[in-house]
Every structure is written in C-alpha cells, then in structure tokens.
Amino acid sequence: MTQEQANQSETKPAFDFKPFAPGYAEDPFPAIERLREATPIFYWDEGRSWVLTRYHDVSAVFRDERFAVSREEWESSAEYSSAIPELSDMKKYGLFGLPPEDHARVRKLVNPSFTSRAIDLLRAEIQRTVDQLLDARSGQEEFDVVRDYAEGIPMRAISALLKVPAECDEKFRRFGSATARALGVGLVPRVDEETKTLVASVTEGLALLHGVLDERRRNPLENDVLTMLLQAEADGSRLSTKELVALVGAIIAAGTDTTIYLIAFAVLNLLRSPEALELVKAEPGLMRNALDEVLRFDNILRIGTVRFARQDLEYCGASIKKGEMVFLLIPSALRDGTVFSRPDVFDVRRDTSASLAYGRGPHVCPGVSLARLEAEIAVGTIFRRFPEMKLKETPVFGYHPAFRNIESLNVILKPSKAG
C-alpha cells in the first residue's frame, strides 16, 4: 500500500461489505441491516466507491444535482469505456451516459410511448404470450418459473411495443441479458461472465437492431415507437443515429432481466407467504401493490444504482471527491425502519408510495408501466391457472453484476379442475 492509499484508508470509514460472497444473493438483508444500523455511508475499497445505506440519504441523492448519472463523470470512466468496446456507444449515448440537457431532450421523445395508456394497449399481447407459455406446460407436474415461463415474457412485450417480428425475440432476449451483464464489466469488482460470450450476443443484437431500424426507415408504420423516433431524428436532428441505437438498445436491455426477476421474486414471495397469497387471490386488485411490495421487501438488485460526484462535497459526514462513485444501496434503503413500519414484514396492503424501487426524479425508470403490466398479468395468471402451486425446492441463485439472479425456481403444479 502506498502512503497516499494509506492516508485515504484512514479518512474513509470502511466496513465489511461483500455483495458477491456466497449466500449474499439468497439473503443480503442481515448483512445490509448491520451496515445500515452502523453508518449512513462507508467506503467500499473493493468496489472503489462510497455506499449509502439509509432511505432519506439515498432518496435525496436522486434529486441532488451535485451527483451525476453519467459514467463520463466517473474518475475511472476511461477504463470503464474501454471495457467491452462493442458497447462504447451505448455507454456514451444511452440515457445513463447523456448529459442532463441531452437526457431531457431524449426522455421527452420517449415518454409518450411509455404512458400507462400507451402500455395498456399491449395487455392482450402479453396475456396471449402468458397463456401460450402456460398451455405448453400445463401437463407437467413440475415447472421452472424462470426458464419455462418468466424468460419468455418480457421480450415478446418489448417486441410488441416496437412492432418487431416474433422471430427476433430470442436474439433480442440474449442481447438484452448480455448487455445488462456487460454494462457491469468495469463497474463492479467481480465479473464471472465469459466476455467472449457476452460480446457475441451484444454484437448479434446490435446488428439485428441496425437491420430493424433500417427496415423501419424504408417502411414507416403508424402509431409506432420506432417510426416516431426515426422521424424525430430525420426532421429535427434531435436524435443522432448513435443515440437512437443506444436508446432502443437500452429499452431492450433494461426491460429484459428486470422483468424476469420481478416475476420470479413475486412468485417466490407469494408462495412463501400463504396469507398474502390468499389476499391477492381474493382481491386481484391488490396484485399491483403486491408487486411493489415485493420490490420493497425483497428487492432484486444486488447492490443498487450509482451516481458520480460532480464536485468535491460533504455528504453524511463523508468527504467525497469529484469523480468518485457512490452506490445507493437500494435494498437497504427499502428496509429502513424510520420510513417503513415493520420493514421486515411482507405486507401486500402496505402503502408503497415511498418506494425507491424505480428511482426518483428525472431518471425514474421510463419502463415502469410496462414492467408492472407484464408482472401483473404473468403472476396473476399463473396463480389463477395453478392455484395449488407449491415450491418444490429453494431457488437457485447465480452470478449477475447487477441483480440477485434467480436462475431456477422449481415449483410443483396442481392445476385446478377448471384448468
């Protein structure tokens, strides 16, 4: 250790934080509760970042202009940008790479396509997809909720939104999952992925995306997201081609794994909570709130979202230097007892309006309505079709740089007499 590093260690409060240790993904809450009770902020040496643990401090950062979303503001941005160069344009021109003025411009173009009314037009297609997946497995005694079900839903919904043929779904699904993982390379300290495999899926997906956009330029459609974005690009130069590719790529990447894990975690928590499940069965209108409670109680993120200091600043008593990374430990913030009563209880009737699961401020997730609709239909339908479904075994978790990755969730199906 150099003298400079030693001096830094003396001024940065360090705590034992091992989000990639065995068993963490299965149940991170005892570890993060100890951290939250001990300190509002600490320095994570392995992750080269600060970590915020408490709700109010995390919530405030979402609207604090001293913190940037763009990785370009990170002191290690050059190193990050060079990791998996095939994604360099997505990192630079995607919503999380744009400066505030460009971010606002792009979000203004995108937001109309993600309103609740616009997304509700996809309800029939999502229901059809869900029914087809369950019909194909209805004769089975066992069922993997992740591989046999959840993985088949989000890309079909996104393809319907973008009016992309179903034959593209699997390639785009691989692209979405690979991109979400690849964006963690260089951002978090451990990546077990075979980089060549990630690059192959990313390259395949980008080529397909360019082809889809070229075809839509030649044959524009009415009431179509891609046509609207392309015409905005052509009419006013408001979207560059790189921005357009990065934006659509981000829609695919952000909407794939997140929705898969939301469905899986929702099924898991409802099966583990018979009283909650009976409430949701008796009152289907509770399902949307139950999904929000899943994300509060058992959040799918391994660590959380990141911000980067735009200037030297003091926060929670810590001296944060310009360019340093700050992780917002979302699963910890959402178990903060100063905000949520009985925070360690799964309560599907809870008021979840204070949840930070989808972010806050100008960077709130634009795909919230779509993810909620997919999960609402997927989870509601599977319990309606198989009301006596039971867990067969504990879920199998794998590695993912961003998510608590449930790889397999095996259940025993007991279909109702009505089918």
Swiss-Prot record:
Molecular function as annotated in GO: heme binding; iron ion binding; monooxygenase activity; oxidoreductase activity, acting on paired donors, with incorporation or reduction of molecular oxygen
Needed co-factor(s): heme
Claim: Heme is one of the keywords in the record: yes
Coiled coil: none
Enzyme class, UniProt record, top EC level: oxidoreductase
E.C. number: 1.14.15.-
Involved pathway(s): Secondary metabolite biosynthesis; epothilone biosynthesis
Binding sites annotated in the UniProt record for heme: C365
Residues where substrate binds: A180, G304
Reaction(s) catalysed by this chain's protein: epothilone C + 2 reduced [2Fe-2S]-[ferredoxin] + O2 + 2 H(+) = epothilone A + 2 oxidized [2Fe-2S]-[ferredoxin] + H2O; epothilone D + 2 reduced [2Fe-2S]-[ferredoxin] + O2 + 2 H(+) = epothilone B + 2 oxidized [2Fe-2S]-[ferredoxin] + H2O
Domain of life: Bacteria
GO BP term (any one): epothilone biosynthetic process
Assigned keywords, A-Z: Heme, Iron, Metal-binding, Monooxygenase, Oxidoreductase
Main function: Involved in the biosynthesis of epothilones, macrolactones which have a narrow anti-fungal spectrum and microtubule-stabilizing activity. Catalyzes the epoxidation of epothilones C and D to epothilones A and B, respectively.
Family membership noted in the UniProt record: Belongs to the cytochrome P450 family.
PANTHER family given in the database record: CYTOCHROME P450 YJIB-RELATED (PTHR46696:SF1), P450, PUTATIVE (EUROFUNG)-RELATED (PTHR46696)
Protein name: Epothilone C/D epoxidase
Species: Sorangium cellulosum (Polyangium cellulosum)
